[in-house]
Amino acid sequence: MALRIRQVLHPESKDEYILTLKKPLDAITKYEYERPVQAHTLGQLNPEEKAWLNQYIHLPEDIEPVAEFKTDRQICQSKDADLCLDHTFFKNHDDYEAEYEYRQDHDGISRFRDILSAVNAKYEKNCPSKIARAAADLQK
C-alpha cells in the first residue's frame, strides 16, 4: 500500500495537490483512489481529507513518510492514452521512466512498443515502483 501527495504545477493559476492511495488487489492489480487536497504533506490533511482516506484504510495518527522524492513529468496525450516521461530525483540518485497510462481500452502494449521502437528503445515489464526505488535509494 502506498500514499502519495502530488503537486501539479499550473504556471497561470494556483498549483493543486492530489492525494493518491494505491491499494493492492493482488500481485499485479492495484486500486488507485485519488482526490484533490489542500495539504502538501500527510500531517497537513484536514479532517474531511482524513475522513475520505479512512474510508479505504486506517490512517494512524503518527504516520511518517518512508521516502520523499520529486518527479518532473512531461505528458503527451492521445485519444487512447497518456505517454508520461518521468525524471525522478531521489536523495542519492536520479532515474527516468516512461509510462503508458490508458484513457480507454485498446491494445496499449503494441502501441507503446511502436512508440518506443521509433527511438530504438525496448519495452521491459514493469520496473520496481517509485516507492520501492526510493526505499532502495535510502540504502545507498
Locate each region found by the language model.
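Intrinsically disordered, low-complexity acidic/polar segments
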Residues: 12, 28, 94, 107-109
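Charged surface patches that recognize polyanionic ligands
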Residues: 1-78, 118
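Extended serine/threonine-enriched, polar tracts that run as long, contiguous segments within proteins
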Residues: 75-92, 101, 111
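Short alpha-helix boundary/capping segments
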Residues: 37-40, 100-104
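Acidic/polar low-complexity flexible segments
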Residues: 103-104, 108-140
